[in-house]
Amino acid sequence: MKKVFLLIATTILNSSILILDSHAGGMMTNTNQNAAFIRNPARDGAIGIDGVYSNPAGVALMPEGWHMSLNWQLAWQRRIVDTQNPVFMRDANNGGSDSKHYRGIATAPFLPSVQLAYNWKKFSFQASGAVSGGGGKCTFDSGLGSFDAAIGRVWAGMLSPVANNLNNLFSAYGLHAKAPVSTGYSSNGFMEGKQYYFGGTIGAAYKIVDKENIKVSGYAGVRFLYGMAGYKAEITDIKVHTTDGAQPLATYINNISNSIYQAGVEAAMTGKTEALQAVTKAGEDLSQQSGQLAKYYNGVYLQSDQNGFGVCPIIGLDVKYQWVNFAFKYEFRTKMNMTNSSTVKEAGLFSAVNQFVDGTSVREDTPALLTLGLELEPLKGLRFDVGYHHFYDRQAKKTYFDANGNRHDDKNQMLSKGTDEWLAGVEYDFGKDKRWTVSGGIQTTNYGNTDEYMSDLSFVTNSWSFGTGVKYKINDKMAVNVGYFQTNYRDYNQAADYRDAAGSNNKFTRRNRVFAAGLDIDF
């Protein structure tokens, strides 16, 4: 029975990334850090002020002077989980069905970013700030399937059989007491998570070769990450349904206890010594089990805030030959230890709560990232872009707790591979003095998801995205970018939930939309 309750704690407390990741990118990384990306995601080989993030070495090829980009993004997302589990048939609120539909709503109304560069002779000094991971809050008003299944397992593992076992015991000894038989259960769930990774970079690029037909520049810099997160989970109004109606959990346990008391009195008064011993033993067992249950009489409420800090180096290279530009960037893995400030003050009740025990820390590394980009401009004002991203997800440490409460820092080893992204885009300058630029691009993202890794508490699925928008040069010193980006996620069918009963399965999908506007200034 202890493992059943351990599953409740594990279910709730392993929900450490139930958030809006409003990004295009890998498991923990936002790559949409400029409005120029929103209108054309294949910016890895492009030269522009947005390159402070996407192609920092190429920024050195911009004209001398100051360059700045101010950006704002609005993102909204839905997470959808369809869960099938045999235990749901006993949920009194589910109409006898073994399936449930869960929908999480997430919004990030204000995602700012800024890129700044000062080019002087062969040098380019750069800095940026953005929400480089996470970016909002996600709320499941009806909880999640893993929540409901945890309560269902408690019912199936203890609440359902206890009355039947007692009634069989009473009948075997000719006692007339009756324990209330349970026919099902019900509860209400709620889950909310928010997470922000604020990233800042400083670095410098240098023109190694600066000739008319070929230019080569290199970059070295550092990224600083500050992570902050908050998680809230509730399971309320837990009730046991019987032939006499629904009863609060405490009331039901009390009625079970009363039936044992009545049986004991009858056994004592009729001189049934063996029956009295058996009933007394049943009472002792119930007392132990009800002691475990007592902390859930008023439901479950857990809240935790986390924060952490990490640093990683970045290197880059840009090679421009006539109308062809190639760029490379590598961001090293960022080690992140997230420290808890939590309502969970001790780990003695369940070892699984170690993930959120106040004052302790867990690993939430940001994986290393390799980007390659190529831009071709065969005609003046017409540019074709392609790019490739690889996130080294499996090498990034991430803490999780198994069903027995044991800590592991290698959850990402459950992935089959790192994340791969392919990008392509096109831009065309037109109008008087080429003041207008229209652009569009696509991106495909493929994760190394496995059934073992996936969970309704933390999931992302393979996707394809498109972005489109325009740029308008107000004058020679200022330009406005406006774009729309949409991600279309594929369904992921999890044949068997590793943390659930046989015969259960999940179908995961998401919907994501982003609108962005930005202002580029040269001075």
Spans of features found by a protein language model:
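N-terminal, post-signal peptide beta-strand-biased segments of exported outer-membrane/organellar beta-barrel
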Residues: L20-F140, S146-R153, F459, F485
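Residues that define the transmembrane beta-barrel architecture of outer-membrane proteins
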Residues: D50, T107-P112, K194-G200, N307-P313, ...
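Residues on the lipid-exposed face of transmembrane beta-strands in outer-membrane beta-barrel proteins
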Residues: G58, P109-Y118, A127, G200-Y206, ...
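Repeated loop/turn-to-beta-strand initiation elements of outer-membrane beta-barrel proteins
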Residues: W66-H67, K122-F125, K211-G218, W323-F326, ...
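Transmembrane beta-barrel strands of outer-membrane/channel proteins
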Residues: M68-W76, A127-V131, A220-Y226, F328-F332, ...
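Outer-membrane beta-barrel translocator domains and adjoining extracellular loop/strand segments
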Residues: I80-V87, C138-G145, G230-K239, D244, ...
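Extracellular loop and loop/strand-boundary signature of outer-membrane beta-barrel proteins
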Residues: S97-Y102, Y185-M191, N298-Q303, Q355-S361, ...
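Outer-membrane beta-barrel "beta-signal"
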Residues: T509-F523
